[in-house]
């Protein structure tokens, strides 16, 4: 293959028959595997949906990796790079003020980087709540005002998807974790020690 001829990749097996389904299932299991990280450091979702032109992806990822190194943080890279969208999740502890600070700083720097490459912050999943704050920066104030006018025309009483896309809250508001909060130790009949307790076991849920 072209990849092999150009010395790209470290494993290039040929997959046939039922093994193809196994490979696809591994890809589908990616999000669940990320959620199974034990402890308070989690693969945070905020920049996981960025997409750039495929030809720009190597440089974009190189700059992103250098940025993460400057922050002294690691990230998880997975999914469909062939579409120009390699899912990126910084591993952060959002239960600390430092983690929340890095959460915002990394997201802001990534927005600037994505715009540099004329990419999108929401290539697949949508802007929603966590990326809505950056929409004016990404598309420009005039385009954003147009979106607000369209929203007002179809939803004059603001009852549909409040705070999503337009008039979104800050990305670090209303999180389900709180920096410095003392968490109770809950006694359980079943053993959740492999997750460091039932609360952290519940935190493995990604909401999907």
Predicted regions and their residues:
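Noncatalytic alpha-helical scaffold of FAD-dependent oxidoreductases
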Residues: 1-79, 84-123, 127-208
């Amino acid at each position: 293959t072209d990849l092999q001829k150009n010395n790209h990749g470290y494993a290039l097996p040929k997959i046939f028959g039922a093994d193809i389904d196994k490979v696809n299932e591994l890809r589908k299991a990616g999000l669940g595997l990320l959620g199974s990280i034990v402890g308070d450091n989690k693969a945070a979702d905020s920049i996981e949906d960025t997409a750039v032109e495929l030809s720009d992806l190597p440089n974009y990822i190189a700059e992103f990796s250098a940025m993460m190194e400057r922050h002294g943080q690691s990230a998880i890279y997975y999914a469909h790079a062939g579409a120009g969208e390699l899912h990126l999740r910084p591993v952060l502890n959002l239960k600390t003020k430092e983690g929340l600070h890095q959460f915002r700083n990394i997201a802001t720097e990534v927005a600037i980087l994505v715009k540099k490459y004329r990419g999108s912050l929401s290539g697949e999943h949508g802007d929603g709540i966590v990326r809505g704050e950056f929409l004016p920066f990404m598309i420009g104030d005039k385009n954003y005002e147009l979106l607000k006018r369209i929203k007002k025309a179809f939803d004059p009483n603001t009852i549909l998807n409040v705070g999503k896309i337009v008039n979104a809250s800050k990305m670090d508001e209303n999180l389900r974790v709180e920096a410095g909060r003392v968490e109770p130790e809950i006694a359980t009949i079943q053993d959740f020690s492999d997750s460091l307790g039932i609360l952290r076991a519940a935190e493995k849920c990604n909401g999907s």
